[in-house]
Amino acid sequence: MNQPWRTHLQTKLKQLHEQGQYRNLHVTEQAEETWLIRDEKRMLNLASNNYLGLAGDERLKEAAIVCTRKYGTGATASRLVVGNYSLYEEVERSICNWKGTEKALVVNSGFTANVGAISSLVCRHDIVFSDKLNHASIVDGIILSGAEHKRYRHNDLNHLEALLKTASPEKRKLIVTDTVFSMDGDTAHLRELVQLKEKYGAIIIVDEAHASGIYGIGGAGLSHIEKDLAQKIDIHMGTFSKALGCYGAYLTGDAIYIEYLQNMMRSFIFTTALPPSTLGAVQKAIEIVQEDHKRRENLIANGEYFRSKLREAGFNIGNSSTHIVPIVVGSNENTLRFSKRLQEAGIAAIAIRPPTVPVHSSRIRFAVTSQHTIADLKWAIDRITHIAKEEELFV
């Protein structure tokens, strides 16, 4: 191997070790269940994004099997060549009916959706206003676009408006935000963001990755808690890989936006389409989340219980108001130690460190699901509290 390269890479890896930011892959089995096997140890699964428990649902499995038998295992090409099976258009129609939009585009992942859409819509002559805690895919899309990047303090509408006021009226402006923030579990102020985008002549993209299938009318997303609000969002992005238990993502909104992205988005044009089996499962999942109110109600209730009990115990869970509940520890070292102790006690509790979260805010990110019982959560809370006291972390 080229020696200068080897030296460079070894130095970088050593730095990651020293900073407590080195990452390993661990073998996991049965992650679609409430209890999983990780490194051959049985643990309560409080780490996955399978929020409604659909990843293991027999109806989705059967839909995937039927489509595999009919269409094969791969799409064989990009959608613009010969990979655009009728399944794609069926799913896109379902998304439009679900979200009340004109046109939709199914893409391969939430990351490629955000990177592709943002880098296609704006360029170096434009300005993007982005919440400081937005997902990495949003940040990377802005960087790739070359647009001026204005980051406003998390959920600070006054700061956002101050930035909008100073922007040149001639420049095109895009506001982009997560709706549910993936590492904090709090939510964006969508009504106020829409008011600002209208006041200053911007457009807005919302990332519903952690809200699709859960919140709003029929689980259509946080922007659908109020029907008239959703209609004022220019582009909605959501994923099938979390509450819907599948894989892939969608972009939807007014037809002209989606038509433009279909023609300009490089992460859509230059990639093989999703396999037919995935589309079959997605179609079934979209049906289920609209009909199965009980799953969504259970998830919301479990989130409320878990948050309230951790707050009562004295933990810092920030402003979480959803099914995503972080315990903010601070240092990488303490967070890794806490995570290790929790896993030894039978809880899948994964340390989240920079650059995923800001420096000095390392945490354990818990995610409850609709399938957890109160007994499961109480069992976990008792152990979390006991270990935190033993480690003299904060309780």
UniProtKB/Swiss-Prot annotation:
Reactions mediated catalytically: 6-carboxyhexanoyl-[ACP] + L-alanine + H(+) = (8S)-8-amino-7-oxononanoate + holo-[ACP] + CO2
BP terms from Gene Ontology: biotin biosynthetic process
Alphabetical list of CDD domains matching this protein: KBL_like
Required cofactor(s): pyridoxal 5'-phosphate
Keyword Transferase listed: yes
Family: Belongs to the class-II pyridoxal-phosphate-dependent aminotransferase family. BioF subfamily.
UniProt name for this protein: Putative 8-amino-7-oxononanoate synthase
Native organism: Bacillus thuringiensis subsp. konkukian (strain 97-27)
